Amino acid sequence: MNIHEYQAKEILSTYGIPVPRNRVALTADQVERAAKMMGGHCVVKAQIYAGGRGKAGGVKLVHHPEQASDVAKELFGKRLVTKQTGPEGLKVRRILVEETVEIAREFYLSITLDRETSRYCLIASAEGGMDIEEVAQKSPDKIHVLTIDPFTGLRTYQARKIALALGLSGAVCEDCVELILNTYKCCLEKDCSLIEINPLVVTRAGWLLAMDAKISFDDNAVYRHREYPDMVDYSQLDPLEITAGKYDLAYIKLTGNIGCMVNGAGLAMATLDVLKEFGGEPANFLDVGGGATREKVAEAFKIILQDSDVKAVFVNIFGGIMRCDVIAQGIIEAANEVHCPLPIVVRMDGSNVEDGKKLLLESGLNVQIGDNLGDGAQKIVAMLAKA
């Protein structure tokens, strides 16, 4: 679960992490008033669920309130396109107005989940303000990584080692140690999958400030925090993702034209890879989970068909907990309800597989059965080419 920059900064500030003075605004008039509060000279920052806003024209330095208002009028309602949004971009509905500071040095700091070790990982670099992936490619020696033992937690000496590695000393070094420890505390208590501060700066006056911040929460822990659902900006989400969430379906929109329905995240990833291998382009990632009912399968299928980019559907199911005949019934029910004319290939195996195949072949749908994953992928690509 993602949140906006201004929300991330509100959370960080409650943990004693210093952030610039700021105000969030929903209208150009509010932006102008906020700019006056900042003394006129300030930064106007579009709030969207994506990075790369500066390069897309979403971050502007202004010198007086009227200019801030003019910039806001340009940004509100505009779709910002960055490398993280896809070609459709994300619409700007909120703007953060923030004071300017004189920066002496910039750093990168983040705590994220390391999937390989299943532990939190602290990443820091003296190359702040840049794309960390770019730094990793060009100057990997400038990135400092620390895997945190969950039993001992992040220790003070480890935080100090990172601060010293960034070239800090004296009082600002100790401030950085405290900031790192507080960031880790925030990660634990708020069930974050990511906290990223980029850049973390030292001002000319010698103060540390989190100039930009990103926080993502673990979706599986949201139930422990009643306030989290109210923090979601649904205007930043794909409508189909919102619908999928209501049925506890994992859905991610992609850029291709083959709709995919799979049970299990690992099998779903393998399905996307095999489709690409045979020249297909997946339109989505959709995991119905291991214990889906006929109704849930039907809703998943209807969600796929609501995407106008989808020109064919590939279903790849292993019926362990799920029965293949139940899957087939859900597909048939949904396809008939929306009068689906698209070519469909179903590859299924497991419980009641023959009953499931029989139901599909007798349904009257434009459906073929895949003998295995590779055969199914080849068939859907071929059917799409003929469509």
From Swiss-Prot:
- Coiled-coil intervals in this record? none
User: Which positions in this protein are listed as binding Mg(2+)?
Assistant: 198, 212
Recorded GO cellular component terms are: cytosol; succinate-CoA ligase complex
Q: For this protein, what does the record note about how its cofactor is bound? A: Binds 1 Mg(2+) ion per subunit.
Q: Spell out the molecular function terms from Gene Ontology.
A: ATP binding; magnesium ion binding; succinate-CoA ligase (ADP-forming) activity; succinate-CoA ligase (GDP-forming) activity
Transmembrane residue ranges: none
Residue span of the signal peptide, if any? none
Q: Which residues bind ATP?
A: 45, 52-54, 98, 101, 106
Gene3D superfamilies the UniProt entry points to:
ATP-grasp fold, A domain (3.30.1490.20), ATP-grasp fold, B domain (3.30.470.20), Succinyl-CoA synthetase domains (3.40.50.261)
What's one Pfam family here? Ligase_CoA
Cofactor annotation: Mg(2+)
Q: Say which domain of life the source belongs to.
A: Bacteria
Give the metabolic or biological pathway: Carbohydrate metabolism; tricarboxylic acid cycle; succinate from succinyl-CoA (ligase route): step 1/1
Q: What's an example GO BP annotation here? A: succinyl-CoA metabolic process
Q: Which residues form the ATP-grasp domain?
A: 9-243
Enzyme Commission number: 6.2.1.5
Query: Which of this chain's residues are annotated to bind substrate?
Result: 263, 320-322
Query: Which family does the entry's similarity section mention?
Result: Belongs to the succinate/malate CoA ligase beta subunit family.
Give the NCBIfam families listed for this entry: PRK00696.1, sucCoAbeta
Role according to the record: Succinyl-CoA synthetase functions in the citric acid cycle (TCA), coupling the hydrolysis of succinyl-CoA to the synthesis of either ATP or GTP and thus represents the only step of substrate-level phosphorylation in the TCA. The beta subunit provides nucleotide specificity of the enzyme and binds the substrate succinate, while the binding sites for coenzyme A and phosphate are found in the alpha subunit.
Instruction: Please identify the protein, giving its name as recorded.
Output: Succinate--CoA ligase [ADP-forming] subunit beta
Q: Which organism is it from?
A: Trichlorobacter lovleyi (strain ATCC BAA-1151 / DSM 17278 / SZ) (Geobacter lovleyi)
What lineage, starting at the top, does this entry show? Answer: Bacteria, Pseudomonadati, Thermodesulfobacteriota, Desulfuromonadia, Geobacterales
